[in-house]
Amino acid sequence: MQRSPPGYGAQDDPPARRDCAWAPGHGAAADTRGLAAGPAALAAPAAPASPPSPQRSPPRSPEPGRYGLSPAGRGERQAADESRIRRPMNAFMVWAKDERKRLAQQNPDLHNAVLSKMLGKAWKELNAAEKRPFVEEAERLRVQHLRDHPNYKYRPRRKKQARKARRLEPGLLLPGLAPPQPPPEPFPAASGSARAFRELPPLGAEFDGLGLPTPERSPLDGLEPGEAAFFPPPAAPEDCALRPFRAPYAPTELSRDPGGCYGAPLAEALRTAPPAAPLAGLYYGTLGTPGPYPGPLSPPPEAPPLESAEPLGPAADLWADVDLTEFDQYLNCSRTRPDAPGLPYHVALAKLGPRAMSCPEESSLISALSDASSAVYYSACISG
């Protein structure tokens, strides 16, 4: 890195001003003169001889006749207004010229507008004979005006813009606009949720950023597109239809008939059930057809645990928690309704197949259907 010389970058002495008498301009002689002058010269230095600054003249007024600000221009304008060619008077103006003066002298306190109304009313009351001299005078003035001003053309004055451009008041609206009205209330005044519902804003852009509540997961979400949904079959009035899954019931009602079809025969049939895979299509083909029943969808019933049957994949671990009495409320091995009043849960097995079946065949079919439905239902729930 190179170093600059000591004198480089130092501030030079300011140049001597030529307009000052005390500035050194002639070498050392000027310095010696200043020192020889003594303290008196230092005490009273000479005043700097600055050039005389030009004096500011007062602002001149604009040229006369320019921008229309001169009095002469205003006078000329007034003279032009007064000297402009006026229209010739009609008969009413000729008559009202003298009549107005007479009414003004008789009624000095009346306004000019009131006098004009009085003159107009009085002119209409005159008959044609009384108006004739004024009509002739107006015709003479028109002919004289035409002679004096042959190139005259009537140019009506423009109306003031203030009358056309009326300012809108804060409460004044345009003709095509209507004041905003609150939406009608379809419900009467109520407390709680009803009032909150009525106070909600209308559906529109306010709901774009809001999300609707997510519904609970349905058992049908796990079904494949090709699989059929489960719908309960229509039931006759004398038969009890399938109840919703885990419907509320009294546990004591299921134990009133221990010797009926809810007991050992159904459990024995479930223990000796054949493989369930071939009968899965039969279960969904027979019971999976949608009917006119408008009620909610119900998942397939659960199956009790099997003792000697082969486990059906990961669903076999869940069968140990299934209660046998909970599954018995959905199936009934008898075709007729029992006489016991405490058994309201029955299903007519005559509607499960196209032909009549005996009791052993019904038991085996019931067990096969229960195994197939349980396997498909649990596999769909686990995979979903």
Curated annotation (Swiss-Prot):
Segments of this protein annotated with the region Disordered: 1-88, 146-218, 293-312
Regions of compositional bias (Basic residues) in chain numbering: 152-166
Motif (9aaTAD): 325-333
GO molecular function: DNA-binding transcription activator activity, RNA polymerase II-specific; DNA-binding transcription factor activity, RNA polymerase II-specific; RNA polymerase II cis-regulatory region sequence-specific DNA binding; sequence-specific double-stranded DNA binding; transcription cis-regulatory region binding
Compositionally biased region (Low complexity): 34-47
CDD domains, sorted: HMG-box_SoxF_SOX18
DNA-binding region: 85-153
Leader peptide range in chain numbering: none
Compartmental location: Nucleus
SMART domains reported for this sequence: HMG
Any one GO BP annotation for this protein: regulation of stem cell proliferation
Pfam family name, one: Sox17_18_mid
UniProt region (Interaction with DNA), positions on chain: 87-100, 111-123
Segments of skewed composition (Pro residues): 48-62, 177-187, 293-304
Location of the Sox C-terminal domain: 263-383
Protein name, entry field: Transcription factor SOX-18
Originating organism: Homo sapiens (Human)
Lineage per the UniProt record: Eukaryota, Metazoa, Chordata, Craniata, Vertebrata
